[in-house]
């Protein structure tokens, strides 16, 4: 068994540039159990980076500080090409750090339980509550409001003010681990929680955190969920090979996607909303045309490709996480073979790889220039994403697919090769 197909020479694959890491304090949190960094997240405006460093602790750090400590600038330009840098263990110890004048503050938050899921949410004041229209609310979220939602192992969800580190809301309805959280990207502060109690719950934070809907349909544990860029569709994935698509205007099930052979643990839409990537314990990342329910691309992590029976068991190549880059052309995945892979949607083999023992999760920065990945020891590692100038054709395709569905593109009076390109059938 190999990590790459026979046609690919591993030595020919580029090594991703490692730029730095965040380390957790050694004491008092030096026990091996409970140190896992189950989740990492970037604020939508790129102002903050957050990660669960184990033992109930979430660390909030201004992303500009991380970049200044590493070897890239805000735009991804290399400033120190020879040596990556690290934020020391001392700099990650508890308490609030007093920032320089004008700099955003850092916070260390004790969430009261092991943090499995985490998400940033920002408000758009003109977006009204979807569930109720009343004049008075306890919380009035302004344009500059930035929230952090944390999902705990006891089923609770806690909402924090990022700028002050204070607890705003405590949401209680799940009966098991909250594995993932995701905010609608339209600024409505609609929050979806995915739990191992087999349920998805929809919360309206503009209505003081009231629960709007429970989405039933998963036969087993729910591991992750993701909104489409226009907030109209939700994808949820879980145990028993489940990949479900939901209409978030009507809160109804659209369809189930079939193709995985094991638990599906991570999902994310492309920036234009045309593609959906799902990661599974069956050693694969599948890229879907979710509007047609068809598979466009399979990114394998074990070769020769395993049989469905072997893929459905303990195959030592479980894919833990997948993330789409902001350029719409690159995908990153973390798997149990101690590698992070950077993929191009135009190729079947990784464009670059990096070593990462015991990786658990990954996320691209808002600009897509940096990938962050959390590990079992609570640390977070950072790499530069392979970058290249996107073609004008790809930029035009992304612009079109933000407003046109696959079915609408297929109805356009254009040549078949162009139609295939616009619907990503040539990836």
UniProtKB/Swiss-Prot annotation:
Keyword rRNA-binding in annotation: no
InterPro entries cross-referenced by the UniProt entry: G-protein_beta_WD-40_rep, SOCS_box, SOCS_box-like_dom_sf, WD40/YVTN_repeat-like_dom_sf, WD40_repeat_CS, WD40_repeat_dom_sf, WD40_rpt, WSB_SOCS-box_domain
Signal peptide: none
Source organism superkingdom: Eukaryota
Sequence ranges of the WD repeats: 129-170, 173-213, 217-256, 259-298, 314-353
Domain SOCS box stretches: 379-427
Metabolic or biological pathway: Protein modification; protein ubiquitination
Gene Ontology BP, a term: protein polyubiquitination
Annotated keywords: Repeat, Ubl conjugation pathway, WD repeat
UniProt cross-references to Pfam families, sorted A to Z: SOCS_box, WD40
Domain description: The SOCS box domain mediates the interaction with the Elongin BC complex, an adapter module in different E3 ubiquitin ligase complexes.
Complexes and interactors: Component of a probable ECS E3 ubiquitin-protein ligase complex that contains the Elongin BC complex.
Role noted for this protein: Probable substrate-recognition component of a SCF-like ECS (Elongin-Cullin-SOCS-box protein) E3 ubiquitin-protein ligase complex which mediates the ubiquitination and subsequent proteasomal degradation of target proteins.
Annotated protein name in UniProt: WD repeat and SOCS box-containing protein 1
């Amino acid at each position: 068994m190999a990590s790459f197909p026979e046609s690919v020479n591993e030595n020919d694959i580029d090594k991703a540039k490692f730029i730095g890491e965040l380390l957790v304090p050694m004491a008092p949190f030096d026990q091996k159990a409970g140190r896992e960094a189950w989740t990492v997240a970037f604020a939508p405006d790129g102002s903050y980076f957050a990660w669960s460093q184990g033992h109930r602790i979430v660390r909030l750090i201004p992303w500009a500080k991380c970049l200044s400590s590493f070897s890239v600038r805000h735009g991804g330009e290399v400033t120190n090409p020879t040596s990556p840098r690290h934020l020391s263990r001392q700099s990650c110890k508890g308490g609030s750090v007093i920032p320089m004048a004008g700099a955003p503050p850092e916070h260390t938050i004790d969430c009261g339980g092991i943090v499995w899921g985490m998400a940033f949410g920002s408000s758009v004041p003109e977006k009204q509550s979807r569930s109720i229209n009343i004049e008075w609310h306890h919380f009035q979220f302004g344009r500059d409001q930035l929230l952090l939602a944390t999902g705990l192992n006891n089923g609770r969800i806690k909402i924090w003010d990022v700028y002050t580190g204070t607890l705003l809301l405590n949401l209680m309805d799940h009966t098991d681990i909250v594995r993932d959280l995701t905010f609608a990207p339209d600024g409505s502060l609609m929050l979806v929680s995915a739990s191992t109690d087999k349920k998805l719950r929809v919360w309206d934070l503009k209505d003081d955190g009231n629960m709007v809907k429970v989405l039933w349909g998963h036969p087993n544990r729910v591991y992750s969920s993701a909104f489409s860029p226009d907030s109209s569709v939700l994808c949820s994935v879980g145990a028993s090979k489940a990949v479900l698509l939901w209409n978030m205007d009507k809160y109804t099930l659209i369809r189930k996607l079939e193709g995985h052979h094991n638990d599906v643990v991570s999902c994310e839409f492309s920036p234009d909303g045309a593609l959906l990537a799902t990661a599974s314990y069956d050693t694969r990342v599948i890229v879907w045309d979710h509007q047609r329910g068809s598979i466009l691309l399979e990114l394998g992590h074990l070769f020769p490709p395993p049989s469905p029976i072997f893929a459905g068991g303990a195959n030592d190549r479980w894919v833990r996480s997948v993330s789409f880059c902001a350029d719409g052309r690159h995908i990153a995945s973390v798997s149990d073979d101690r590698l992070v892979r950077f993929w191009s949607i135009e190729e079947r083999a990784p464009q670059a790889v990096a070593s990462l023992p015991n990786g658990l999760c990954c996320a691209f920065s808002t600009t897509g220039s940096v990938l962050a990945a959390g590990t079992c020891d609570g640390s977070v590692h950072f790499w530069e994403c392979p970058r290249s100038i996107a073609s004008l054709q790809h930029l035009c395709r992304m612009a079109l697919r933000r407003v046109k569905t696959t079915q609408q593109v297929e109805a356009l009076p254009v040549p078949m090769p162009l139609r295939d390109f616009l619907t990503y059938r040539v990836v």
